[in-house]
Every structure is written in C-alpha cells, then in structure tokens.
C-alpha cells in the first residue's frame, strides 16, 4: 500500500489556491497556513516573512507531484515577485517548499519547462526551498471560498493551458548552461 504524500505551495492569497487545488484528482486534503518564514506560531496578524501557503496531501497512485506543480503554474503568475493580482508583499510570493531531493529536482525541472515554454511572459521567480514549519491558519481562512463562493480570488484555471516538456537535448543544454536552455 502506497502512503499519501505531502506538498506545500505558495502563490498569492491562499484562499484561491486552496479552492482550485482541492478539486484536483488525487488530492486527499488541503489546509491553508504560513510557511517559509521567520516567526514561530505564525498567525494572519503576525506571520513575519512567511508566505501564505497551502499544504496538500495527495495520493501518488492517482496523481503525482509533477502534475500538481503543472496545475500550480497554470493557476497563478510565477513571474511576478512578491505579488499576485492586487496582493503585494512577501506573503504573496510564489514558492515551492520541498520535502526531499526528488521533490526539489521535480520542482526545478518543472520551472525550467515553464520558462522554456513561453506560456508566461517573464522569468519565473518562484522560490524553491526546503519545507520547514507549516503553521495552520485560523479556522476562518480554511476552505474560505467553499463557504463564500463569491469571495476574493486572483487564481483561475486557464483553459487550454498545457505545459510542454523540454526535449532531452534542450534539458541537457539547460543543465549545463541555463542561458542556453531556452
């Protein structure tokens, strides 16, 4: 029996991110919170340099980490530093917090594919960092858009958005010299 796996992603206000990710095949559960920062016991009013993030528990027999990341890059703009929509500041940065070297490798490879694809107009600024503490947000933030369907969000599914994978040759060139890989 394969056990569930965990991912932590940040990409703007956690309400919209959670709402779209929760419905993906293989996602078992989600919760919103704060990660990647410097304050213990982070709260909405005091989260220091933490990003608003979503912790995702997923069944790897139904979906994989790469598929989750491809969807993540579809529903938020990974090229705007410390900003999504009208939300500005480090709390709203794009970030992937990985749990092991395999997740790190997949994250970096997916970012390289996003950059090579030209689907976004600029350079990807998504932070890739080891997962640390995840401080669960207050109850009023959990499942927010499920309770308030017309609430604020700056995330949306882009119909027809598909991330192509780089060819083996371009991936090799990118790993040897990042500026040659595009």
UniProtKB/Swiss-Prot annotation:
Cross-referenced Pfam families: PMSR (PF01625)
SUPFAM superfamilies membership: Peptide methionine sulfoxide reductase (SSF55068)
Reactions mediated catalytically: L-methionyl-[protein] + [thioredoxin]-disulfide + H2O = L-methionyl-(S)-S-oxide-[protein] + [thioredoxin]-dithiol; [thioredoxin]-disulfide + L-methionine + H2O = L-methionine (S)-S-oxide + [thioredoxin]-dithiol
Keyword Oxidoreductase tagged: yes
One GO term (biological process): symbiont-mediated detoxification of host-generated reactive oxygen species
InterPro entries found in the cross-reference section: Met_Sox_Rdtase_MsrA_dom, Met_Sox_Rdtase_MsrA_sf
Tree of life domain: Bacteria
Keywords: Oxidoreductase
GO molecular function per UniProt: L-methionine-(S)-S-oxide reductase activity; L-methionine:thioredoxin-disulfide S-oxidoreductase activity; peptide-methionine (S)-S-oxide reductase activity
E.C. code: 1.8.4.11
Keyword Oxidoreductase: yes
One Gene Ontology term, aspect cellular component: cytoplasm
Record-linked NCBIfam families: msrA
HAMAP family attached to this UniProt entry: MsrA
Protein family per UniProt: Belongs to the MsrA Met sulfoxide reductase family.
Function of the protein: Has an important function as a repair enzyme for proteins that have been inactivated by oxidation. Catalyzes the reversible oxidation-reduction of methionine sulfoxide in proteins to methionine.
Protein name in UniProt: Peptide methionine sulfoxide reductase MsrA
Organism name: Mycobacterium tuberculosis (strain ATCC 25618 / H37Rv)
């Amino acid at each position: 029996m394969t056990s569930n796996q965990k991912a932590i992603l940040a990409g703007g206000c956690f309400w919209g991110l959670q709402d779209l990710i929760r419905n993906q095949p293989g996602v078992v559960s989600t919760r919103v919170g704060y990660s990647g920062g410097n304050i213990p016991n982070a709260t909405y009013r005091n989260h220091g340099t933490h990003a608003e993030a979503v912790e995702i528990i997923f069944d790897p027999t139904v979906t994989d980490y790469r598929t989750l990341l491809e969807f993540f890059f579809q529903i938020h703009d990974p090229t705007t530093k410390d900003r999504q929509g009208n939300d500005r500041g480090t709390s709203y940065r794009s970030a992937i917090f990985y749990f092991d070297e395999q997740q790190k490798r997949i994250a970096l490879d997916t970012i390289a594919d996003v950059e090579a694809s030209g689907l976004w107009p600029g350079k990807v600024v998504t932070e890739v960092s080891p997962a640390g503490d995840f401080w669960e947000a207050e109850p009023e933030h959990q499942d927010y858009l499920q309770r308030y369907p017309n609430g604020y969000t700056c995330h949306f599914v882009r119909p027809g958005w598909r991330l192509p994978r780089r060819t083996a040759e371009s991936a090799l060139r990118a790993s040897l010299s990042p500026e040659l890989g595009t």
